[in-house]
Amino acid sequence: VNLTVLCPHFDPDLAPTGVVMSRIAHEFVERGHRLHVVTALPWYVRHDVEPGWEGRLVRTERTDWGRISRVHPFPTDKRNIPARALAFGGFTTLATLVGASARERPDAVLAMSPPLTLGPAGRVVAGLRRAPLVFNIQDVFPDVAVELGLLTGARVIALARRLERMSYRAADAVTVLSDDLADNVRGKIAAGLPTDAAERQRAKVRVIPNFVDTDRIRPGDRDNDYRLEFELIGSRVVMYAGNVGFSQSLDLVIEAARRLVDSHPDVVFVINGGGSARPELERAAGHSPNIRFVDMQPIERLPEVLAAADVHVVPLRTGLAWSSVPSKLYSILAAGRPLVASVDEGTEVARTVVRAGAGVAVPPDDADAFVAALLGVLEDPAAAERMGAAGRRFVEGWASPAAVAEAYEGLFTELVDRSGQDPRSG
């Protein structure tokens, strides 16, 4: 089939959603499909357009499998909601125009959120080409922004929720990462509708998890080049690797480091990555000898970064685990390392940690429980080894990149068949 993809990030951008979509696109190509990817110019790492990519609103690349159109993302401070809304509006407008004006007629359109605005953009592109739309939800917005206090005011929140419902209902299918997120979206998509219409809307929501590449991410030596480069040899390493944003309770990591600096001087807390919250965290950390900030590493080093930890942490602020499933969770399991998750009880993240036997789940923003869990893992190397091995065994049965692409392929085929469209006519 010919597929149009609207997404906020794509290779070589290093955003987690960009890595996910790039690999799924690769799998689509391997299956013989052609793609037109409409995305942003690379900007995630520096929160600004990368050197060499500036100076143009739209940049088009031809490939042997189709085309990539990159449009300006208009990056702004995440905490400045009005400016960010305008930025999303600018990016979405450009993406819509580029997607709608392409000569190739897509057989299906795949749009990714966040940003939520790509849902209506996908609807416009799909509607003009009489193609079905699949709306993929990585994080549920505006829930995340509301929980973080980034979106305030009853009218603003009501408007955002109206846009959310409209986007879900306008799609032919909505894909989410977990049962928690499916329940969340089904409740909203059916709200206020008659029984029959509500059931039809709920039936559109499908669970297709993000993949984990267990062939690329494998258990490795702790004392590797990463540890050598950042002077971690001989230390017990507590690692956070990922986006340093406001969704994560990384102040909990700073507090844990403060509590252990004297009693456990060989324990070093590493925050590997960049993001809007990092400057504030660095100020809070001061000159603590047991905290290291490391810039985001090239994607090729991910297995090495993950292997360097004795224990990983996945801290989410209260309420956020109901609307977000960090992809890093499955990468940690693939690396064969134990983890401590500070998340809401009963959520997908907490259930996965317990079900896999791969670590400890504690309540969010509870420093006492968090520190106790870390020490429990660090002080019992044999148990930590068992947890890591159990996580690896668990994730080996998880969705591979090929399996996730196959699930989407089946969904596209179902929707195209239902619409009566012949893919060969495009």
Q: Which residues fall in each region the model found?
A:
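A charged, aromatic-enriched C-terminal amphipathic alpha-helix characteristic of glycosyltransferases
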Residues: 365, 369, 379-412
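Nucleotide-activated donor-binding/catalytic signature segment of Leloir-type glycosyltransferases, i.e.
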Residues: 264, 278-303
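Carbohydrate-associated surface elements
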Residues: 41, 180, 211
